[in-house]
Swiss-Prot record:
Keyword Amino-acid biosynthesis attached: yes
Gene label: ARO7
E.C. number: 5.4.99.5
Gene Ontology MF, one: chorismate mutase activity
The species this protein was found in: Pichia angusta (Yeast)
Domain Chorismate mutase per the UniProt entry, residue ranges: 3-256
Record note on quaternary structure: Homodimer.
Stated name of the protein: Chorismate mutase
One GO CC term on file: cytoplasm
Length: 280
């Protein structure tokens, strides 16, 4: 997928490849995080005295991480959504003028606050090595958290591209649902239970196959792994529902933008095949 070439962004094969790679990244990031205990102090607001900052240790580290990455254009990319947009800085590198693919308000579709809350309260307890503190590894723990959060965010916000493809392909049907503000109807239109089952089945097999990552970055804890059933539950209960929320939120506002002159061209065969696949 090349964001400088809009015709590749909604291509069925490219979409599928991107989603599969994201699954791999998320699973291996979970394996990295599973080396460490839950360490709830990392997520407790003002647990540590950080100068000129009000928030948790993870909030601070993640915001600093995003601030630095913004200087090298990470958040100029259409598929990256920051957790702390207020800390982003201008890049010193030449600006990249990405062609428009999404609606003008796409950057406003941001569920990262929900992702962060669910991650710290629901996901970490399921993948951590234990429920207690691990004071000697707080920094490594938080760094692993950041990789998990950013990979989850990219996967979930990819729903904006899915939604745009469905809007173009469905035409009057989806326009009518948007005009009626029919959230249930839109949800039904974007849901494909058969494809969802295939995703979960694939994740179960990947979880069994991957087991332990032999290239753990922070330590070499050979017992570190995440139960395949936990990975499936995370996708079923959180990743897929949040992706659908992103799609619905995007579609409900889609009529704010006037249709592009090239809408007919963009609704070619590859979008029809994408929709029939039910990928999200």
């Amino acid at each position: 997928m090349d964001f400088m070439k809009p015709e590749t962004v909604l291509d069925l094969g490219n979409i599928r490849d991107a989603l599969v790679r994201m699954e791999d990244t998320i699973i291996f990031n979970f394996i990295e995080r599973s080396q460490f205990y839950a360490s709830p102090s990392v997520y407790k607001v003002n647990q540590f005295p950080i100068p000129n900052f009000d928030g948790s240790f993870l909030d601070w580290l993640l915001s600093q991480h995003e601030r630095i990455h913004s200087q090298v254009r990470r958040y100029d990319a259409p598929d990256e959504v920051p957790f702390f947009p207020n800390v982003l800085e201008k890049t010193f590198l030449p600006k990249i003028n990405y062609p428009s693919v999404l609606a003008s308000y796409a950057d406003e579709i941001n569920v990262n606050k929900e992702i962060l809350k669910i991650y710290t309260s629901e996901i970490v307890p399921g993948i951590a090595a234990g429920s207690g503190e691990q004071e000697d590894n707080l920094g490594s723990c938080a760094m692993a958290d950041i990789e998990c959060l950013q990979s989850l965010s990219r996967r979930i916000h990819f729903g904006r591209f899915v939604a745009e493809a469905k809007f173009i392909s469905e035409g009057d049907k989806i326009v009518d649902l948007i005009k009626k503000r029919d959230v249930e109807g839109i949800e039904a239109l974007i849901t494909n239970a058969e494809v969802e089952k295939r995703i979960l089945d694939r994740l179960l097999e990947k979880g069994r196959a991957y087991g332990t990552d032999p290239t753990l970055k922070f330590t070499q804890h050979i017992q570190s792994k995440v139960k395949p059933e936990v990975i499936v539950k995370i996708y079923k209960d959180f990743v897929i529902p949040l992706t659908k929320k992103v799609e619905v939120d995007y579609l409900l506002r889609r009529l704010e933008d006037e249709e592009d002159d090239d809408a007919t061209q963009k609704s070619g065969g590859y979008v029809d095949r994408f929709l029939s696949s039910g990928l999200y």
